[in-house]
Structure formats: C-alpha cells, structure tokens
Amino acid sequence: KVLSSLHNAGIEVLEYCELDTVDIDDIIRIAFALPNSTQAVIGLGGGKVIDAAKYMGFLRKLPFISVPTSASSDGFSSASASLLINKRRSSVPARMAYGIIVDTDVIKSAPEKFLYSGIGDMVSKITSLYDWQFEAEHGAAQVNDFAMMIAKKAVNSFVRTPFETIHDRLFLK
C-alpha cells in the first residue's frame, strides 16, 4: 500500500528491502549496496526498521524520512540508533529525521501497549530534561538547545492537551 502511494506521488523507489536485523554489519552492507542515485532513505515500520534506516542515512549522508507505525517511543525522530554490535545492543550516532510522516489511523490500530509505552517515554522527558541541564551545569554533558526545545514543546503539548483516555480524538492530534 505504501509503495503504491509513493508511486502515485511520483516518488521512484530505487531499492526496497524488508529488514529483520539491526546487526551493524548487515546494515552497513545494505547501505553501501544502495544505488548511487539514491536521494533519501525511508524507514517505514517499528523501532528496528527506523533505527536501521536512520543509520543507513547517516552512513550514506542522505536525508532520512521516518514513517513510524507505532508510537511506543520517540525514537523515530532521534539522532541515535540502537544496533547490534558484536551481538550487544549499542547506541550509535545516526541521522535525525529530515521529515516524519505519521498516519494516525495506523498508530491508532497498533496494540494499546505501544501507546502506553509512548506515554511513559513522554512522561520520562519531564525529569530527563532537568537531568540533562544538571549534567551540563556540572560539566558532564552538553545541552543541545534545539533538542531541548523540541522535547519541551512535546511535553508541554502532551500535558496540556485535554484528553481523558487514549481513545479520545485529541489524544493523537
């Protein structure tokens, strides 16, 4: 369905690959097998697929377009990826999304546990932003003002939106 939508929009898909791995060696191999005429990397799916696509964009210095199918975390927009390196999960630098396309009907159709996980991820930002500032004040980290602003806006939007349950129309607005 998505491929036909891209085609109808005049977007030529040069390479289509279904991933079942986040092993860094596999991702590197796939990234450098992409045609040289590739203009962007699109990640459509859950966390593993998004992380793999982000890292491919990073390696090839290409824009990365994120198309998440669940809202279990905000990883679809972050500039890091969780990959397997020597069979261990590691966080590596990746490409921040150039654009994010979200079909709220797809997000709504995901299992509720993913929405609750996303709520937990959002609520944790409230304290993590203060932790980040504290670390910066004590020389343990550097604050990225843009990332801080985006996170604060997301938290403020979430806590100020008047919804009672995840089924309310305003919840995913």
Regions found by a protein language model. Give the residues of each.
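A glycine/threonine-rich phosphate-anchoring loop and its flanking beta-alpha core
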Residues: 58-160
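Oxyanion-binding "anion nests"
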Residues: 157-173
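Glycine-/small-residue-rich active-site loops that bind phosphorylated ligands and cofactors
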Residues: 21-22, 48, 71, 107
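ATP/NTP phosphate-donor binding region
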Residues: 1-40
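A short, small-residue-rich loop immediately preceding and capping a beta-strand
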Residues: 34-56, 60-71
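A polyampholytic, Gly/Pro-enriched intrinsically disordered region
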Residues: 32-42, 84-93
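Short active-site-adjacent helix-start/loop capping segments
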Residues: 21-25, 50-52, 75
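A generic local structural motif
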Residues: 27-30, 50-52, 86-88
